[in-house]
């Protein structure tokens, strides 16, 4: 299994941001695919513009499902891009 982080910005190109309710609704899509994950709230910047960002961390072998979630987020919230990074760590569940 590998550890991935997905960076989900909340600024919308037409103005406004992803609301708390919109985010909670989107989380249901993640719940339907992954039984465990962590979400952190961060301050990010994309092309010089500051924005609230959610960082989704998942330990999985299902990278295709993670990419699908990122693509869905990008489409639903009209994002320019969504960053997925693979972390160089080996998870150990005790």
Language model: regions and residue ranges:
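Positively charged, small/polar-rich N-terminal and surface patches that mediate targeting and assembly
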Residues: 1-94
